[in-house]
Amino acid sequence: MGRRAPRGSPEAAPGADVAPGARAAWWVWCVQVATFIVSAICVVGLLVLASVFRDRFPCLYAPATSYAKANATVEVRGGVAVPLRLDTQSLLATYAITSTLLLAAAVYAAVGAVTSRYERALDAARRLAAARMAMPHATLIAGNVCAWLLQITVLLLAHRISQLAHLIYVLHFACLVYLAAHFCTRGVLSGTYLRQVHGLIDPAPTHHRIVGPVRAVMTNALLLGTLLCTAAAAVSLNTIAALNFNFSAPSMLICLTTLFALLVVSLLLVVEGVLCHYVRVLVGPHLGAIAATGIVGLACEHYHTGGYYVVEQQWPGAQTGVRVALALVAAFALAMAVLRCTRAYLYHRRHHTKFFVRMRDTRHRAHSALRRVRSSMRGSRRGGPPGDPGYAETPYASVSHHAEIDRYGDSDGDPIYDEVAPDHEAELYARVQRPGPVPDAEPIYDTVEGYAPRSAGEPVYSTVRRW
């Protein structure tokens, strides 16, 4: 067990495992990746089968609860309201996006397993460490649990077990939040995370792209799906509360709006306070929050339209307050997105990262293309050929980020003009400032026939005739 291998044995070779059990841990990680892929494929296949055999999944694909129109002449003084639910298109779109993101995360883990072998003579311990940078064990477990809980939710809805289905979906949402957060942080501090990623630039450039830029894209996608699921999670929590307590119709709308606002604001604050130190450019969660706000607003409008007289009789103006609250949530998400983009831009500009250099070059190329289009449009309006004027080209298009650019936008490359014409005015001013004989100059008048007074010195014109 713990006995050291004798010298000269195959176990004592340089490629042998340094840490005991590293090879077993590596195979366990591979099995977790395989089960994650199978779970994601199963949940995608289940949704596809549910769309084909709709009779087998009646509760999942059933239309939203139809509320009978109340008699306007009857005074409504109370009563227990029906639980609010999402419409079919919004619910299925949320499930489909979630399952697709889970499958993409599983494929990403498989790609990370392939690129983790960046050297031929790489032992299991070092390869396991490189593979964990793509996706740790805890993230894989959360992904597996998340996929299976979503399948259980769909099957429970198919069997019309609504309350248990909503409870399972709340657990699925909690696992999805943990999956997205742990995928972003890997369970380490931000400084350690950055040092580990930057340490792969030279020895493993391919694996660095996977755990660096590609991982940032996957983080945005998972956070987008997580914030998008806040609408379905808020509806599930509201349904559980409505099935256990006596809610009126206005209370149903207010409870749903409050739960949704708490979920969105809390997650966006976590993104801005914690996760932004790992991935600077995070716009996915804000887009997901805005989309989820639209889904909740649509569900509230349908619910209010079906029970208009009940809602207005029990709590007049409740729907107006719901609309204002949802608008404030969307505005908060938009403001946080602007704040995140501004802080990310300032960070990349201060550290002069490659992302900032590429963004600056892209902006210069876009400005150059826009100037060419404008010049061609002006040429076409004047009736001449569109042409390609010289000022349409900017020097940034052909200058790399390593070249030095002066304050006017010119680099230290080739000169703009190959031949410079002589300046006659400068020569004339030089003669005025320094009067004297002009060497080898041609006479101004060759055949002057008049009288000119002579000075004490040499004659000005050598060919003037006296008479």
Curated annotation (Swiss-Prot):
Residues spanning the membrane: 33-53, 91-111, 138-158, 164-184, 221-241, 251-271, 281-301, 319-339
Topology class, membrane: Multi-pass membrane protein
Side of membrane Virion surface, spans: 54-90, 159-163, 242-250, 302-318
Topological domains, Intravirion: 1-32, 112-137, 185-220, 272-280, 340-467
Assembly: Interacts (via N-terminus) with gN (via N-terminus). The gM-gN heterodimer forms the gCII complex.
Domain of life: Viruses
Compartments in which it is found: Virion membrane; Host Golgi apparatus, Host trans-Golgi network; Host endosome membrane; Host nucleus inner membrane
Keyword Transferase assigned: no
Record keywords, A-Z: Disulfide bond, Glycoprotein, Host endosome, Host Golgi apparatus, Host membrane, Host nucleus, Membrane, Transmembrane, Transmembrane helix, Viral envelope protein, Virion
Protein name per its UniProtKB record: Envelope glycoprotein M
Gene field: gM
Organism whose genome encodes this protein: Human herpesvirus 2 (strain HG52) (HHV-2)
